[in-house]
Structures are given as C-alpha cells and as structure tokens.
C-alpha cells in the first residue's frame, strides 16, 4: 500500500516547519507569498490530499500529556519545553497538551515512585489519548495499556516494550563510546584508572552508555576502577565518588553517564583533585557550561532532551491522528560539548 503524503513530508522536503506548511495550505497569514507558492507547488508534486486538516476539525480534540520524572527538574524541564513547543506547532490540528513535572527532590524514594505511578494512573483515568513519559517502569504503564492510552517513553525506555508504542532516546551505546575515547585521548597517563558514575543498574538508558564505554575500552584500553550506581541521587553520588577517590589514588577520570554530576564534582573538589581528574559529564545546563569553561569538566555528552520531547509529540500525533506507522525506536545522535563549541548550546 502506497504511503500517503502528509504535511510532515512536505515540511521535510522544503526544510520548513509543519506550522508553516499548515498556514500555507489553509491560506492563513504570516507566510511569505513565495513560501506559500512553493508549499502549494510541492504539495501538488507529492500528491498531497489536504484532508488531514479537515479531519482534525471534524474529529474530537486529541488530548496529550507529558510527564517529566527525574531527580533534576532542570533536565526534564527541557524535555517538557520541547513538548510544549511541538504543541504550539500543532495548535491548528485540534489538540491539547498538558505537561507535568516532578520537583520534589530525589526520584529514588518510595514517595517519588508513588508520584509517578499516581500521575500516570490519573492520566489513564483522565480521558487522555496519549502520554509521553520521561521516567522509568512503574505498574501504571499496565493500567495505561488497559485504558488504551497510547504511551511512549523518552530518554529512558521500559523493560516491557509491549506497554508502549515507541521510544525516543539518544544513541546511548555511542555516547558511552565517545566518553571512553575522550578520556583515553585526554588522559596524560593512560595507566591511571577511571570510574563510571552511573544511575540505576540495569536501567536501559544507563545500561547502554555503560556498555558503550566498556566496549570502547577494548579498542582504547582503560583500567576501570569501578562502576558506581548512584540512583540519580546527588548525595549518593558524592559519597561513592569520595570513597572511590580515597581507594584509588591513581584515579585519572570519571564518566558521569546521567545528569547527576553535582555530587561527583563536590567530591572531586573536596579531594583537591579538580582539574587533575578528567570528568566527562552528560547533557548541558548553565552550571555545566561554567564547569567546562573553568576546566573542572572537560566535556559533556549532550542527548538533546528538548528535541526528544518535540519529536515525540509530533510522532505521537502522527500515529493517533493519521494512523501513521512509527518506528519502535527513534534515535537522536549524541553531541560532544566542549569549551571550543560551548557557545552553540
């Protein structure tokens, strides 16, 4: 069966937003006449049948939710911002979007898990059609499936993939390889040991970066002192890093494969070895930018959770509104952020 052309295909062909294509096709303002002409010409060439907009007005409003659940609001708020921007881009297509974020401290407590489970159950009972979840596996995913709410995971996947429609994530295996090679190339004495400050043992997002790091050490050999699981808790990360520094006087580098960098930095600074121990972090924020500028962190592997959120809502809309096929796993390429290119982020 031939794939029907959508406004997403036209937008991709022309390198413009779906909102621009929509305004051009519907005769709305705020579109240059040359752009409107080009959109209409391309739509005709691609065999576009302008029925998607009409269907969106005829059907009931589609309701979407997004949940950001980590110990670090600064991290998951970027994901939610991407979802909100996608909602604005789809504003003419009869949808609504509600964004919910966790801001009650560490996410590794029973109270935090109850928040995530309860929030997803409320969404299942709240008449929503789809939900994007940046979090981890809880029983409520089964309840969402029972209620026939389309669920998708972002940044981190869940173990039972039958409970979600698709996942969007960074290429974690590659991110881990990049981190290992960076440390190998930058380490003055390659005989010194390195550690991985990870999140949860077995959690897909953390497991993939760990595996990538370890795989790369087969090509660029590094002595792994320890993989520490810090449960996305800054205090646990501080304690484990301080212990590793005491036990491994030769420690030359640390790869932090989650946003949980503050405890690691504090321990390294208190040991008097800031700038001596190479630190590769993950993602980016204003504080991390400053740490890179001052040399405490040499680089960070950025997974662009904003774009994961924005793309996630678009893909979910396509799946529910247009019954379009969606890849099971949608990957975002990781990027290296260093002093030399930090102004781009």
Model-derived features: where do they sit?
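Hydrophobic alpha-helical segments within soluble ligand-binding/sensing domains
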Residues: 166-193, 237-238, 288, 304-321
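Short, solvent-exposed amphipathic alpha-helices that sit
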Residues: 75-91, 175-179, 204-222, 240, ...
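Amphipathic helical "hinge" segments at domain boundaries
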Residues: 49-114
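N-terminal helix-turn-helix DNA-binding module of bacterial transcription factors
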Residues: 1-60
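Hinge/cleft segment of the Venus flytrap/periplasmic-binding protein
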Residues: 201, 217, 304-345
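Short beta-strand elements in bilobed, periplasmic/extracellular small-molecule ligand-binding domains
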Residues: 87-116, 193-196, 214-235
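Flexible loop/hinge segments that line or gate small-molecule binding clefts
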Residues: 136-174, 285-293
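Hydrophobic alpha-helical
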Residues: 115-119, 123, 129-146, 213, ...
């Amino acid at each position: 069966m031939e794939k029907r052309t959508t406004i997403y295909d036209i937008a991709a062909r022309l390198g413009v937003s779906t909102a621009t294509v929509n305004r051009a096709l519907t005769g709305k303002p705020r579109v240059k006449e040359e752009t409107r002409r080009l959109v209409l010409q391309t739509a005709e060439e691609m065999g576009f049948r302008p029925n998607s907009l009409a269907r969106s007005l005829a059907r009931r409003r589609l309701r979407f939710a997004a949940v950001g659940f980590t110990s670090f609001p600064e991290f998951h708020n970027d994901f939610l911002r991407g979802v909100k921007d996608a909602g604005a881009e789809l504003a003419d297509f009869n949808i609504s979007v509600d964004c919910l974020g966790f801001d009650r401290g560490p996410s590794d407590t029973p109270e935090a898990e109850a928040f995530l489970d309860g929030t997803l159950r409320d969404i299942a009972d709240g008449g929503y059609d789809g939900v994007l979840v940046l979090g981890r596996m809880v029983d409520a995913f089964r309840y969402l499936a029972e209620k026939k709410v389309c669920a998708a995971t972002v940044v981190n996947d869940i173990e039972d993939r039958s409970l979600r429609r698709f996942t969007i994530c960074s290429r974690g295996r590659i991110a881990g390889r990049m981190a290992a090679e960076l440390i190998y190339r930058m380490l003055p004495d390659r005989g010194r040991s390195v550690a991985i400050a990870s999140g949860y043992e077995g959690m897909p997002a953390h497991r993939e970066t760990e595996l990538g790091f370890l795989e790369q050490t087969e090509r660029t050999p590094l002595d792994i002192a320890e993989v520490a699981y810090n449960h996305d808790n800054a205090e646990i990360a501080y304690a484990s890093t301080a212990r590793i520094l005491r036990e491994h006087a030769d420690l030359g580098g640390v790869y932090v494969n989650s946003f949980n960098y503050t405890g690691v930095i504090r321990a390294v600074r208190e040991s008097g070895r800031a700038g001596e121990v190479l630190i590769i972090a993950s993602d980016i924020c204003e504080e991390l930018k400053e740490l890179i500028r001052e040399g405490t962190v040499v680089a960070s592997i950025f997974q662009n959770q904003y774009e994961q959120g924005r793309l996630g809502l678009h893909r979910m809309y396509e799946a529910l509104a247009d019954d379009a096929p969606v890849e099971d796993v949608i990957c975002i390429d990781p990027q290296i952020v260093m002093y030399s290119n930090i102004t781009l982020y």
